[in-house]
Curated annotation (Swiss-Prot):
One Pfam family matching this protein: Glucan_synthase
Gene: FKS1
The reaction(s) this protein catalyses: [(1->3)-beta-D-glucosyl](n) + UDP-alpha-D-glucose = [(1->3)-beta-D-glucosyl](n+1) + UDP + H(+)
EC numbers for this chain: 2.4.1.34
Protein name per Swiss-Prot or TrEMBL: 1,3-beta-glucan synthase component FKS1
Effect of substituting E1111G: In F4; temperature-sensitive mutant; lower beta-glucan content of cells
Outcome (variant: T828A): In 1014; temperature-sensitive mutant; no gross alteration in beta-glucan content of cells; partially K1 killer toxin-sensitive
Record function comment: Alternate catalytic subunit of the 1,3-beta-glucan synthase (GS) complex. Synthesizes 1,3-beta-glucan, a major structural component of the yeast cell wall. Involved in cell wall synthesis, maintenance and remodeling.
SMART domains cross-referenced by the UniProt entry: FKS1_dom1
Disruption phenotype: Cells are hypersensitive to immunosuppressant drugs FK506 and cyclosporin A (CsA) due to the inhibition of calcineurin phosphatase activity by the receptor-drug complexes and is dependent on calcineurin for vegetative growth. It confers a slow growth phenotype which is partially suppressed by exogenously added Ca(2+) and exacerbated by EGTA. Simultaneous disruption of CNA1 and CNA2 or CNB1 is lethal in FKS1-1. Disruption of FPR1 or CPR1 results in the loss of hypersensitivity.
Upper lineage: Eukaryota, Fungi, Dikarya, Ascomycota, Saccharomycotina
Amino acid sequence: MNTDQQPYQGQTDYTQGPGNGQSQEQDYDQYGQPLYPSQADGYYDPNVAAGTEADMYGQQPPNESYDQDYTNGEYYGQPPNMAAQDGENFSDFSSYGPPGTPGYDSYGGQYTASQMSYGEPNSSGTSTPIYGNYDPNAIAMALPNEPYPAWTADSQSPVSIEQIEDIFIDLTNRLGFQRDSMRNMFDHFMVLLDSRSSRMSPDQALLSLHADYIGGDTANYKKWYFAAQLDMDDEIGFRNMSLGKLSRKARKAKKKNKKAMEEANPEDTEETLNKIEGDNSLEAADFRWKAKMNQLSPLERVRHIALYLLCWGEANQVRFTAECLCFIYKCALDYLDSPLCQQRQEPMPEGDFLNRVITPIYHFIRNQVYEIVDGRFVKRERDHNKIVGYDDLNQLFWYPEGIAKIVLEDGTKLIELPLEERYLRLGDVVWDDVFFKTYKETRTWLHLVTNFNRIWVMHISIFWMYFAYNSPTFYTHNYQQLVDNQPLAAYKWASCALGGTVASLIQIVATLCEWSFVPRKWAGAQHLSRRFWFLCIIFGINLGPIIFVFAYDKDTVYSTAAHVVAAVMFFVAVATIIFFSIMPLGGLFTSYMKKSTRRYVASQTFTAAFAPLHGLDRWMSYLVWVTVFAAKYSESYYFLVLSLRDPIRILSTTAMRCTGEYWWGAVLCKVQPKIVLGLVIATDFILFFLDTYLWYIIVNTIFSVGKSFYLGISILTPWRNIFTRLPKRIYSKILATTDMEIKYKPKVLISQVWNAIIISMYREHLLAIDHVQKLLYHQVPSEIEGKRTLRAPTFFVSQDDNNFETEFFPRDSEAERRISFFAQSLSTPIPEPLPVDNMPTFTVLTPHYAERILLSLREIIREDDQFSRVTLLEYLKQLHPVEWECFVKDTKILAEETAAYEGNENEAEKEDALKSQIDDLPFYCIGFKSAAPEYTLRTRIWASLRSQTLYRTISGFMNYSRAIKLLYRVENPEIVQMFGGNAEGLERELEKMARRKFKFLVSMQRLAKFKPHELENAEFLLRAYPDLQIAYLDEEPPLTEGEEPRIYSALIDGHCEILDNGRRRPKFRVQLSGNPILGDGKSDNQNHALIFYRGEYIQLIDANQDNYLEECLKIRSVLAEFEELNVEQVNPYAPGLRYEEQTTNHPVAIVGAREYIFSENSGVLGDVAAGKEQTFGTLFARTLSQIGGKLHYGHPDFINATFMTTRGGVSKAQKGLHLNEDIYAGMNAMLRGGRIKHCEYYQCGKGRDLGFGTILNFTTKIGAGMGEQMLSREYYYLGTQLPVDRFLTFYYAHPGFHLNNLFIQLSLQMFMLTLVNLSSLAHESIMCIYDRNKPKTDVLVPIGCYNFQPAVDWVRRYTLSIFIVFWIAFVPIVVQELIERGLWKATQRFFCHLLSLSPMFEVFAGQIYSSALLSDLAIGGARYISTGRGFATSRIPFSILYSRFAGSAIYMGARSMLMLLFGTVAHWQAPLLWFWASLSSLIFAPFVFNPHQFAWEDFFLDYRDYIRWLSRGNNQYHRNSWIGYVRMSRARITGFKRKLVGDESEKAAGDASRAHRTNLIMAEIIPCAIYAAGCFIAFTFINAQTGVKTTDDDRVNSVLRIIICTLAPIAVNLGVLFFCMGMSCCSGPLFGMCCKKTGSVMAGIAHGVAVIVHIAFFIVMWVLESFNFVRMLIGVVTCIQCQRLIFHCMTALMLTREFKNDHANTAFWTGKWYGKGMGYMAWTQPSRELTAKVIELSEFAADFVLGHVILICQLPLIIIPKIDKFHSIMLFWLKPSRQIRPPIYSLKQTRLRKRMVKKYCSLYFLVLAIFAGCIIGPAVASAKIHKHIGDSLDGVVHNLFQPINTTNNDTGSQMSTYQSHYYTHTPSLKTWSTIK
């Protein structure tokens, strides 16, 4: 050992003379900490320099004897074990310490243990800790003698703890790390060593740690070292290498070296090293590396890991960039090993590493996203493709070419410096000139072409083949229906063979897009030219011969040559499609994915190191996708494409006989069937994508069910006996009984575990005392005299009688669910647990921002807001009646005991029963009678444990601590015997073990800025759970004026001393480079706290989850899933391992777990959200994890901490882009070779949103986040490199779900367009008498009719498809419920959903998903939306619901509904009823799911609010107004101006950057134009007088009608606005002096006129159409679409940016432009505002009419008696007896409400009457008018009015060309000629 230590001691110049040690013996322990705080002037904090005044932690200047230069060795130079005073051995590094050290408690020498052991009267067996009731002096807490026993207890440990400390201190001095960071990382490292060495020898523990962090095959550092070819840099230097291609000479040498490598004997290291001298291949480099690593001494290994941890611990944002950190570490290591460092005498100043190395990179990262304006950070208006993000920065270090780009200020390249000098010059690097984009996240749909190219090939090519085969009329010469003549065979083959050309074209486009996304200057960019030319050749091969076939001869000539060529080309096309479907784009025709070359090894290592599937998993993956596509292709062909065959044949060959349009005659109307056919095919094409997803869901569900039976999870598994065998299973699966001596009876051990579970449920008030008695094991006298025996509860046996529900639990209770799942889960295969002593240490990490910690009394017993009808406590009592009953009984017992203790029992006896009932009222009402804090606190806790609070999460996950103590005690009975009756000593021992193995870390970034009540709650948490660790951000003012404040990451727990200012003194306080919150918040919050995690694994938990004792007992098995517990004692650096063998090593990175959504059964929406989460998190995760498609979804996944933290952390953090931050960590793990598993037997609780709005906020966040994911490089790597089966799994499990929603909405819109055109076609045509069973060559009657019936029947097919696609979404929920809870529960839940209209909600949610995705990909602006945590009992005002959902769903629903109305009236079909239901959902869902929407009074008060919402905000700013909503909607497109004037209205504005014009044209204008064109064509056709005998003079001018009705309202509005603007400018300021409402009056006039004008032109259209309702409808629809198009163009192309304040709007109406803070823009703004107001007036009219229509449609419901009660039952699933009472108002309030209701009720019915009049009036008039209105007009306006009473039947004898023989005999055909 000494030889190893020698060089190290040479480096440290720490004298260990006796004088230095003796001088401190009295007052200080061996590490220089004051032993008796009374003797020390203050606790030494390295952050406070001597002489500076005490900082906010209230420190005195450090003691004189302390303030010595640490290089003299007086700080830690004492010999070990010197501090004998306390018999304790503490280090200032450890988390424990004597009083006065940061790891100690503030309560002096004793503190109350956070959890007491089970079994004692005060024991805590529950998630609710016990407060009070015991004397804190009773338990004297002797702190553990050794904080890291597994390492220090073993005499074999290769390095002593003192030597490790010396290493950390030495590194800190030499490289300038912070003192607190060093202490933190030392503790971190020791906990890691302790955790490992508890299950292996210390030597192996250190070796395996070094292998994981630095040198092993799975270590990221080693992978990077070889990927970036740093072995070459170390050998010959990058500056001496020509980076890039190998020369011919080098290639020859490479072959020779490879041969030498194969011949070498790996056992003889020396000989092999000599042989491979000069060989730069990966195998040789790997051999050299292993040999080098194998020779390291333990001290050097410690030094390597310590240096990495110290770098990582202070890297703050750089932790997200794993390889950048590796580079910094490499530079530091080179410097450390060099003589330059050894010879340096004075230490580096503290903080040098942070300030010199990390902060410049931090500033670069921050400046990419933010700029400083007036001293505050403002987000730059850059989209992702202009921001050099974390990934771009990181990828610079992947390739030597990138590292070569690093330049210093003086222009020198870093690689030109010697290795040892690089670290010292890192501060001089000009990072701004170094980093660049390595992947452009351009906001475009083209990413989908590249990333998912194989999906398009599989669908578009096959659809082409199916379609071409079934459309013979397109390539048949002179097709005649009566003959049904067939095309040439060659043409049939050739047109199908074009599918191969389509596939090649897709690949070419994908490659071109890739060219634009991956900048060529990045060394990792693939060389695409070769692939591009190859693709062009394949394209030519596929297309050339087909051109030959079609051009070779006329379509009347049969040619054998053409036939043969066409047939061969068909098979070539099939081969092309199969090849392109299977081959990833990344591997096409290039060496990019080949392992043989070192050129792209970095991209393979970091973006394509997928863990392969093996054995059954691989075959299962293949089977899933073969089944899906076999089913899909056959079903699509027979159901979708064959049904098109007849419509294609008819529509493609029919020409219409119509008069046409005044301006262009019959050009358009003749081809109407072909236009309809195009629309039908387009709609069917979208459906072709949809049904793949449908089959994926079905097959996935089937496989998942199969697996659940196989695992024995299902309740339907016949052999289950889950309760009878439960005790045996607890013994075999929960307890680690293998190493245990047999002398203890299993029953004794099982009983302790079982009783603890039952008692914990009793303490959580889930079980009443009588239930508990039946469920516990009891001690009863034995038959043997004097002995006692255990009696098992009858529960285990009587389960089979099926009467257990009533006897043992409350029916359908939480206790029943938990015990059932526990029993069920133990019947599945579970990894064997290790003894507690040997289990690894792990941490639970929870980020917290502003979520509720603990509910306040006010929140519980006061109504939420004016719209709520119930207090939270009332609602919770209704949801959990049994638990409330138990709680009240418990409280009463407590109150009686307290009363008895105070001596009042005599009075109690005298009270009669009635009085006691009255006395109990307060208990049952609010849970307490006395307002003493201990009673109110109990009620607060009871409510908090049933809401989504942080307290619930912490109390739930602190059960790990209880579980560990319980298991340790049960499995080690000798410990209990050893302590005898000393309960305190036993508890201390158990505490020690729990603290060693489990940590709970909450990242409360805002703690330092908490309000008093939040601080009080946080302090309450720390007192209840002293072992809870809280990391927070601490801020200090800057040292010099004008600089940024200093920000620290600090850590406290419940043992930290409380200072005078009420705050706690932190254990660790590490300075950061600046504010760490640069992204969307959550990932940065996790990252800053990550340095405080301990152990080998982290469980990531959100602040609204829960856990249970019985689940925590399984923790050892869950951790065993990482496959690292039974490590064989192998040397990872053994020289025999070949490079090829090690590439197969893929560690488990993430273990996912199930979630139980505890908000289910609290109403329909909560239950839908819960069902969705269950199927996604359980049913699908089960199959996905097996076939390698599961990613990481945040909670409640366990992660392999070393694997993830060395690869960029637990989430990604670029603002906007990484919106769903968790999933990126999963993709990152998958790309870098980690495996992701799913654990079936363990589940946590999770809260979900319960309100309509909050659920859809979450939906919006997920949808927008998916839009951002589509742009991300992870999708690019996965999509272009995964093997086909894994790619399909990934696609359909993640983006496919969202694109499927998008396709559903797209197909719905396409269908509406098709329906409008098809209905107008059917409306105007005389249909044939159609019989599908007759041959198609029969003569159609009447002669000259149009046989459109098959096309009309297609609507039925389409409806059925959409219907199935929709209902299939419910299959997984039902199946999941079926297998987990049985048939009855599944049926019950399904019918509850149906009766509660949950399908309506599903349709709406699907629209929100697709709308969020669409708008994100077009406009951007995705932001983090915090999801709701409360209960949805408030009635939300109509105006808020309307403004929230109008843009995303209601407008689209209303437009489609008008089109559907036209379709229904023009040509009625029963299947259209389904669309009426769907579209009603889009319009009415927000109001149907609004609590108390139909309460009479509330409805009309809400109407009042709506009217006021429409009219306010024009005189002065109002937070909630129509104009505000319109401006915000518009700003998403136009963006905001930067100029601020400090007005209140600016606060609400937020950030919105201007959308890219190209995107707006693609996403807003073009679809709008297509829609307008589609409606316009249908409108002109329905007016084209089909079949009417006319002359050219009779052509109608329907186009002019559209022009008039579209533009006239806009022109009138413009006139009104000019008038108002003139009025306001001239007289507004004058009026303003006396009238306060000038603006409102002006706006009111303009808005009123706009509404009247739009309604008037609706009637005008009716008149122009000669009062024909059908034609008027399509006319109005067309006008609306045309106006939309005009307004979109105006907004996108004419409007400048919006002001953040509201001044321009108010100035327009009041005329006060001056003094509004607009500066010179006051001159240009009026014209901009005028343009905006033109659009606004039409929008106002639309919102006024649409809002009223929605309100009027609710009238039939409002007038139903007791509707509110039925509606509440539907929403909340509360029985009528448990209904929420109506609110109670004072008399004055009641009178006021009644008056308002009368007033607005009258207004409502008045508007209703006017609307009715507008419809009834023209309808009545139409019956009175018989002659053509426009007869008297001539010229252009001659046929402005549609002629009436014309006959359009020109069939049979009415035909103009009728001859008796025509169409009654078969015409003769041309004869064929044949060429040989």
